Curated annotation (Swiss-Prot):
Biological function: Component of the eukaryotic translation initiation factor 3 (eIF-3) complex, which is required for several steps in the initiation of protein synthesis. The eIF-3 complex associates with the 40S ribosome and facilitates the recruitment of eIF-1, eIF-1A, eIF-2:GTP:methionyl-tRNAi and eIF-5 to form the 43S pre-initiation complex (43S PIC). The eIF-3 complex stimulates mRNA recruitment to the 43S PIC and scanning of the mRNA for AUG recognition.
Residue ranges of domain PCI in the record: 331-537
HAMAP family recorded: eIF3l
Protein name: Eukaryotic translation initiation factor 3 subunit L
Disulfide bridge positions per record: none
Length: 564
C-alpha cells in the first residue's frame, strides 16, 4: 500500500489507514508549492508540517499493527502469516518509497524532526521511536551538511544499543518483523558508523579540549569489542551457521533453527551479521578470519538468503579483496568477474532507486579496478563482456602496470581498497596528524612489497612465450640480469604463479594449489625448456549452445502462436 502523497490524484476506495487527500500539501500551483517549501525550510524543526505529522502517524500505525499481529502469532505459536507478510510489505513501501520521497522534498540537506518532537504524535511508543531514530541518524550521516556532531555520534550508538538489546535480550522472540532491505541497512549502517567514528576520533587537530576530554572519558563508545559482540550475538541467537550448514547439505534449515532462528527477523539479521563480520575483519586487515566467518555460505550457488542486492555485492567485494591480498588471484578474479557480470545484467533494476544505484555503482567501479590489478598480476581468461569493459576503463593503466609502473598499482589500490581502520583508541595526548591514515598506509606498504617482488614477472612471461628452448645465460642477457639473478626470478615466477584455488566444498578457504599461467617451463642443466599451456578457445561449443537456445526459443514461440 502506497503512502497517499505518492498518488494523490488517484480515486482509490477509502482506506482507513491512508491519509485524507487534503493532507497532501500540493495545491496544483507550482509557485504556491515552491513558496510553501521555502517557507518550511526557514522554520524550526519543532514546526512540523501536517503532511509529515500524518506520515509519522501512518508509519507508526503500520509498525504498531504489525507488532500487535506478531504478538498474536507468537501467542498462537505461529512463526508468520499472510497478515504479517502484508504488513511487512506496507512497511517496505513506506521505507523505500515514501520516506525517500519526503526526505527529498523536505529534508534534502537538513535533519528530520527530532524524536522528542514527534514522540507525542506516536504516543511515546518506545519501539517505534528507536526505529525512527535509526533512520534519523542515518540521514544525518548521509545527507546533512557537516555530518553528525560528537553528541549525535554518541546518541546514535546508544540508539543501536537499545535496538539490539530489544531484539537480543527479550524473554522470547521480539514481536517485530522488518523488510529484509531495512535489516541489511541496519547492519550495514551500524558498521559504517563504527568505521566513521574510528576515523573521527583519530583526527584531533580541529577538536576542542572539551571534545577530546569527552572522547578520552568514553573509550567504550563505538568500541570494537562491543561491535563484534553485537554481530556475534545476532549470529548465535539466530543459529544461522547451523541453518546454513543444513541448507547447503540439502536439509531443512527450519529443523535446526531453534526458537529464535525460525523467525525472519533473527534469521536475516544473523545472515547479514555474517557479512558484517566479513566486512569488519577486512577493515581490520584480518583477511583469513574475514573469509572464515562465511565458511557455511556457498558463494558459488544462488542462496535463498541473498535477497538484497547490496548485501550480495558487498559480500563479493570483500571476499574478492580478501582473496587478492591473500595472493589467491584466481579466486579473486573468479569472484570479481561473477559479481560484475551480475551487476551488468541487473543494472537497470538498481537505477530505479538512487541511493542503491550510487552504492552499487561505486563498488562496481572499485571492483573493476581490483580486477585490473589481479589480471595484471595473474593473467587468465575471463568473460568477454567483462574483459571489454575492463579494457575501456583501465586499458592504458593495465599496460603501464604490465611494464611495472608501481605508481599505477598504488593509485588503483588506494581508490578501490576498503577504508581500513585501527581498533585501538588513540593516545589523545600525542596523536600524530596522519594517525588516521596509518592502517591504510600499512596495507598499502604490504601490497606494494608484493608488487615489487613480481615487478619482473610480466617481462619474463613475454620472453618465455617467444621460445621453446633457450640457454639460461642467453635469456638472462636479454633481461640485463646475471644468470644467478635470472634463476632467482624464475623461481619467483614458479612460486607466484602457483595459487591456492577453490575447486569444491562450501568453505571459501578450501582449495588446492594450481597454476593457470599460459606458460610453464623447467630447467635442465643450463637449458630452459618452455611449454605453451594456453588452451585454444573452443568456439564450436559456444555456437552449438546458442543454436540449441535458438531452437528452444523457436519452439516456444510456435506454441504461443498456436494458442486460441
Amino acid at each position: 500500500m502506497s503512502y497517499p502523497a505518492d498518488d494523490y490524484e488517484s480515486e482509490a476506495a477509502y482506506d482507513p489507514y491512508a491519509y485524507p487527500s487534503d493532507y497532501d500539501m500540493h495545491t496544483g500551483d507550482p509557485k504556491q508549492d515552491l513558496a510553501y517549501e521555502r517557507q518550511y525550510e526557514q522554520q524550526t524543526y519543532q514546526v512540523i508540517p501536517e503532511v509529515i505529522k500524518n506520515f509519522i502517524q501512518y508509519f507508526h500505525k503500520t509498525v504498531s499493527d504489525l507488532i500487535d499481529q506478531k504478538v498474536y502469532e507468537l501467542q498462537a505459536s505461529r512463526v508468520s502469516s499472510d497478515v504479517i507478510d502484508q504488513k511487512v510489505y506496507e512497511i517496505q513501501d513506506i521505507y523505500e518509497n515514501s520516506w525517500t520521497k519526503l526526505t527529498e522534498r523536505f529534508f534534502k540537506n537538513t535533519p528530520w524532526p527530532e524524536a522528542e518532537a514527534i514522540a507525542p504524535q506516536v504516543g511515546n511508543d518506545a519501539v517505534f521511536l528507536i526505529l525512527y531514530k535509526e533512520l534519523y541518524y542515518r540521514h544525518i550521516y548521509a545527507k546533512v551538511s557537516g555530518g553528525p556532531s560528537l553528541e549525535q555520534r554518541f546518541e546514535s550508538y546508544y540508539n543501536y544499543c537499545n535496538l539490539f538489546n530489544y531484539i537480543l535480550n527479550a524473554d522470547g522472540p521480539a514481536p517485530l518483523e522488518l523488510p529484509n532491505q531495512w535489516l541489511w541497512d541496519i547492519i550495514d549502517e551500524f558498521i559504517y558508523q563504527f568505521q566513521s567514528f574510528s576515523q573521527y576520533r583519530c583526527k584531533t587537530a580541529k577538536k576542542s579540549e572539551e571534545e577530546i576530554d569527552f572522547l578520552r572519558s568514553n573509550p567504550k563508545i563505538w568500541n570494537v569489542h562491543s561491535v563484534l559482540n553485537v554481530l556475534h550475538s545476532l549470529v548465535d541467537k539466530s543459529n544461522i551457521n547451523r541453518q546454513l550448514e543444513v541448507y547447503t547439505s540439502g536439509g531443512d534449515p527450519e529443523s535446526v533453527a531453534g526458537e529464535y532462528g525460525r523467525h525472519s527477523l533473527y534469521k536475516m539479521l544473523g545472515y547479514f551479521s555474517l557479512v558484517g563480520l566479513l566486512r569488519l575483519h577486512s577493515l581490520l586487515g584480518d583477511y583469513y578470519q574475514a573469509i572464515k566467518v562465511l565458511e557455511n555460505i556457498e558463494l558459488n550457488k544462488k542462496s535463498m538468503y541473498s535477497r538484497v542486492p547490496e548485501c550480495q555485492v558487498t559480500t563479493y567485494y570483500y571476499v574478492g579483496f580478501a582473496y587478492l591480498t591473500m595472493r589467491r588471484y584466481q579466486d579473486a578474479i573468479r569472484v570479481f568477474a561473477n559479481i560484475l557480470l551480475y551487476i551488468q545484467r541487473t543494472k537497470s533494476m538498481f537505477q530505479r532507486t538512487t541511493y542503491k544505484y550510487e552504492m552499487i555503482n561505486k563498488q562496481n567501479e572499485q571492483m573493476h579496478a581490483l580486477l585490473a590489478i589481479a589480471l595484471t598480476m595473474y593473467p587468465m581468461r575471463i568473460d568477454e563482456s567483462i574483459h571489454l569493459q575492463l579494457r575501456e576503463k583501465y586499458g592504458d593503466k593495465m599496460l603501464r602496470m604490465q611494464k611495472g609502473d608501481p605508481q599505477v598499482y598504488e593509485e588503483l589500490f588506494s581508490y578501490s581498497c576498503p577504508k581500513f581502520l585501527s581498533p585501538v583508541v588513540p593516545n589523545y595526548d600525542n596523536v600524530h596528524p596522519n594517525y588516521h591514515k596509518e592502517p591504510f598506509l600499512q596495507q598499502l606498504k604490504v601490497f606494494s612489497d608484493e608488487v615489487q617482488q613480481q615487478a619482473q614477472l610480466s617481462t619474463i612471461r613475454s620472453f618465455l612465450k617467444l621460445y621453446t628452448t633457450m640457454p639460461v645465460a642467453k635469456l638472462a642477457g636479454f633481461l640485463d640480469l646475471t644468470e644467478q639473478e635470472f634463476r632467482i626470478q624464475l623461481l619467483v615466477f614458479k612460486h607466484k604463479m602457483k595459487n591456492l584455488v577453490w575447486t569444491s566444498g562450501i568453505s571459501a578457504l578450501d582449495g588446492e594449489f594450481q597454476s593457470a599461467s599460459e606458460v610453464d617451463f623447467y630447467i635442465d642443466k643450463d637449458m630452459i625448456h618452455i611449454a605453451d599451456t594456453k588452451v585454444a578457445r573452443r568456439y564450436g561449443d559456444f555456437f552449438i549452445r546458442q543454436i540449441h537456445k535458438f531452437e528452444e526459443l523457436n519452439r516456444t514461440l510456435k506454441k504461443m502462436g498456436q494458442r486460441p
